[in-house]
From Swiss-Prot:
Binding site for substrate: T49, C50, N51, R52, S105, E110, P111, Q112, Q116
Family listed: Belongs to the glutamyl-tRNA reductase family.
Binding site for NADP(+): G185, A186, G187, E188, M189, I190
Known EC number: 1.2.1.70
Keyword Oxidoreductase listed: yes
PANTHER family named among the record's database cross-references: GLUTAMYL-TRNA REDUCTASE
Residues carrying the site annotation Important for activity: H95
Protein name: Glutamyl-tRNA reductase
Domain commentary: Possesses an unusual extended V-shaped dimeric structure with each monomer consisting of three distinct domains arranged along a curved 'spinal' alpha-helix. The N-terminal catalytic domain specifically recognizes the glutamate moiety of the substrate. The second domain is the NADPH-binding domain, and the third C-terminal domain is responsible for dimerization.
Family matches, as NCBIfam families: hemA
More details: During catalysis, the active site Cys acts as a nucleophile attacking the alpha-carbonyl group of tRNA-bound glutamate with the formation of a thioester intermediate between enzyme and glutamate, and the concomitant release of tRNA(Glu). The thioester intermediate is finally reduced by direct hydride transfer from NADPH, to form the product GSA.
Keywords assigned: NADP, Oxidoreductase, Porphyrin biosynthesis
Length: 416
């Protein structure tokens, strides 16, 4: 078995590919059970965010594991294959460390990915698909991420996706304080966005969510008006700015709904940021003249602001990561000797029990205890040394030299 990571992210695949391989919260447990249930992998954890879907696993059949991703999402492997990355052993470990530290994010140094990876581990634990190897790797991953964030300035002055959404809205409207804002969803991303937009004092804020109770909870925090998703067709036209990020597998806003809203607004423009993967807004909406539609990938230029000033922090972070990769792979290597050590100890225990039982019988017959102890010790010595001696004596000339060197090292022999 070996560590293996594979998937797609914003570096390798466009949004229309990423949304087809995303896993919803509801499908995660089924996906993990399906992957491990097919005995393609021994362990597995799935990280699925707006920017990446990647699978960390312990497997002897990497190619079959990769093929599972396409099969699970009912895709042709040939359509997905050009966008996939595959990382084995130390490269998989290094990738996990970089992702958790925010070095692989669209927003360099952003902290949200660490929480998302922790959620992925929690899901794998609940599904029973997290074994010793992945558990240890993720433990070290979270340790490294903490060290990178506390020892470097990697997160300093970073522009989050939420902040970028607000900045982009300001570029369109100039002043958000004169606009009405609608948030669709009530998860972490919407909560972050709401904080940035509300800080700019919009005229009115509405929160729409499938579960009205969650909309009400978020609305109370930001002095907003809660509504259900069913009210969107009537409410959409009242808002100038729409920010959406739900876990819906199907679009929330279609072209027809936006056309009706624009007509009601007498063609006053609407600014929409869709941070969801899969997308909440149909791609055809971009064809409407009075809609400024931005998807998550469209925010890349804004979130890269200030990147040049943090290159020193990136170098420091990479050094920390490289050191920890070496340490972790050393631990993995030592694990390979565990079965042999266990077998050796079990063999020794069998010898001990056999000789001890023999000694008890001799004592029961009234044999001299000193002679019994002598027999016990010589019996153990002979049993321990018989096989190594036999292997050395029957080895070929080429084998013998290596075996002699190995025995000298194992037993720390010094020839006088």
């Amino acid at each position: 078995m070996q560590l293996f990571a594979f998937g797609v992210n914003h570096h390798t695949a466009p949004l229309d590919i990423r949304e087809h391989v995303a896993f919803s919260e509801e499908s995660m447990q089924h996906a993990l059970h399906d992957l491990v249930g097919h005995q393609l992998v021994k362990e597995a954890a799935i990280v699925s965010t707006c920017n990446r879907t990647e699978i960390y696993c312990n497997t002897d059949t990497p190619d079959k594991a990769v093929g599972w991703l396409a099969d699970f999402h009912h895709l042709r492997f040939g359509d997905l294959e050009p966008y996939l990355y595959r990382l084995l052993r130390e490269q998989a470990v290094k990738h996990a460390f970089r992702v958790a530290s925010g070095l692989d994010s669209m927003v360099l140094g952003e902290p949200q990915i660490l929480g998302q990876m922790k959620n992925a581990v929690k899901s794998a634990e609940q599904a029973g698909t997290l074994g010793l190897l992945l558990h240890k790797m993720f433990q070290r991953t979270f340790f490294v991420a903490k060290e990178v964030r506390t020892s470097t300035e990697i997160g300093a002055c970073s522009v989050s996706m939420a902040a970028a959404s607000a900045r982009l809205a300001e570029r369109i409207f100039g002043n958000i304080s004169e606009q009405k804002v609608l948030f669709i969803g009530a998860g972490e991303m919407i909560e972050l966005c709401a904080a940035h937009f509300v800080a700019r004092h919009p005229v009115h804020v509405t929160v729409a969510n499938r579960t009205v109770e969650r909309a009400e909870a978020l609305a109370r925090r930001f002095n907003a008006h809660p509504i259900s998703l069913g009210e969107l067709p009537d409410q959409l036209a009242l808002h100038d700015i729409v920010v959406t990020s739900t876990a819906s597998p199907l679009p929330i806003l279609g072209k027809g709904m936006l056309e009706r809203a624009i007509k009601q607004r007498k063609h006053r423009p609407v600014f929409i940021v869709d941070l969801a993967v899969p997308r909440d807004v149909e791609a055809e909406v971009a064809e409407l003249d009075d809609v400024f539609l931005y998807y998550v990938d469209d925010l890349a230029d804004i979130v890269k602001e200030g990147l040049d000033n943090r290159q020193g922090a990136v170098t420091q972070a990479e050094t920390i990561i490289e050191s920890n990769v070496v340490d972790f792979m050393h631990w993995v290597a030592t694990r390979q000797s565990v079965p042999t050590i266990r077998a050796l100890r079990n063999q020794a225990e069998r010898y001990r029990r056999h000789e001890l039982a023999r000694a008890h019988k001799l004592l029961a017959k009234g044999e001299d205890p000193e002679k019994v102890l002598e027999s016990l010790s010589s019996g153990l010595t002979n049993k321990f040394l018989h096989l190594p001696s036999s292997v050395l004596n029957h080895a070929t000339d080429d084998e013998r030299e290596q075996l002699i060197e190995l025995v000298n090292r194992l037993y720390q022999l010094h020839h006088s």
